[in-house]
Amino acid sequence: MTTYDPSQKSLGKEKLSRIPVKIEATHTPLRKPDWIRIRLSTDSKVSQLKKLLRENHLVTVCEEASCPNLNECFGHGTATFMIMGDKCTRRCSFCDVGHGRPDPLDPEEPVNLANTVSIMSLRYVVITSVDRDDLRDGGAQHYAQCINAVREKNPGIKVEVLVPDFRGRMEKALDQLAQGLPDVFNHNIETAPRLYKQARPGADYPWSLALLQTFKKRFPGIPTKSGMMLGLGETREEVETVMRDLRQHEVDRLTLGQYLQPTRYHMPVDRYVTPQEFQELGELAKKLGFSNVASGPLVRSSYHADLQAQGERVS
């Protein structure tokens, strides 16, 4: 069993010291508007779930990425599992997940994940991961093993994956993923291409679009999904262009949410998008042909993913 050592990863200032576009530390961040306030929970379910996760040597993106919805989701007994460790090979300046030399894959992780999902009595599970540029298939085989283990232990469950870009190894990764296909395939486009060098160093906008479309062409019966964060400095026109690009690349579902700065060393919040604008963008997305849209300040790609999959409104 692989034990993850959180002391061996860089965070915040240290993590972002080597990205190509330097970010000045924020000294006077924008004041959060009332609609972005997050209620903290003292529910015992939160601590119980954290205990269960640690006992099974599992990591959640909810914790690692400092998700604003953690208390709500944990309080309801749901979580988005982050496989393949807690150290990412990328240094995205919007993300709070740590950077470092990844640990070896844990061969027991698929079974531990399946058992935890069973204990939680989940009917819908989201599996994501760090980027693993050190692996020849980007970790796709491990994804398939986790999906298959979860399904074997939990008959009837629906599995959504939120995958990295598998840059430089798309065909190999999709060949491996074909051995354990998900019910929903999600890869987040994150932001407008103009901001990629600053926000997503190591990623490539056309490549991400191609990954989504290539998966759809190979597995046309599986819904594809992507998401954007707003408030990084993009314009309304750029948001609409990205939405159209996603539709042109056969993406079925869309999430839009507000970017929140994890620390003062990360990309600053350029603006807080109003609930009204989120509603307008959601309506436009539906007109563009997305079958399912979740648009709101606290929406994240896996926030109430089960309800998103059922077509219910999430905002």
Swiss-Prot record:
Keyword Cell membrane: no
Predominant place of localization: cytoplasm
Domain Radical SAM core: from-to ranges: 73-291
Functional pathway: Protein modification; protein lipoylation via endogenous pathway; protein N(6)-(lipoyl)lysine from octanoyl-[acyl-carrier-protein]: step 2/2
GO CC annotations on file: cytoplasm
Record text on cofactor binding: Binds 2 [4Fe-4S] clusters per subunit. One cluster is coordinated with 3 cysteines and an exchangeable S-adenosyl-L-methionine.
Catalytic activity, reaction form: [[Fe-S] cluster scaffold protein carrying a second [4Fe-4S](2+) cluster] + N(6)-octanoyl-L-lysyl-[protein] + 2 oxidized [2Fe-2S]-[ferredoxin] + 2 S-adenosyl-L-methionine + 4 H(+) = [[Fe-S] cluster scaffold protein] + N(6)-[(R)-dihydrolipoyl]-L-lysyl-[protein] + 4 Fe(3+) + 2 hydrogen sulfide + 2 5'-deoxyadenosine + 2 L-methionine + 2 reduced [2Fe-2S]-[ferredoxin]
UniProt enzyme class: transferase
Disulfide bonds: none
Residues where [4Fe-4S] cluster 1 binds: 62, 67, 73, 302
Keywords (A to Z) from UniProt: 4Fe-4S, Cytoplasm, Iron, Iron-sulfur, Metal-binding, S-adenosyl-L-methionine, Transferase
Xref: Pfam families: Radical_SAM (PF04055)
Gene3D superfamilies, per database record: Aldolase class I
Cofactor: [4Fe-4S] cluster
One of the record's GO molecular function terms: metal ion binding
Subcellular location, record wording: Cytoplasm
SMART domains, A to Z: Elp3
EC annotation from Swiss-Prot or TrEMBL: 2.8.1.8
Annotated positions binding [4Fe-4S] cluster 2: 88, 92, 95
Superkingdom classification of source: Bacteria
Family annotation (InterPro entries): Aldolase_TIM, Elp3/MiaA/NifB-like_rSAM, Lipoyl_synth, rSAM
NCBIfam families documented for this protein: lipA, PRK05481.1, PRK12928.1
Family per record: Belongs to the radical SAM superfamily. Lipoyl synthase family.
Protein name: Lipoyl synthase
Organism: Coxiella burnetii (strain Dugway 5J108-111)
Gene: lipA
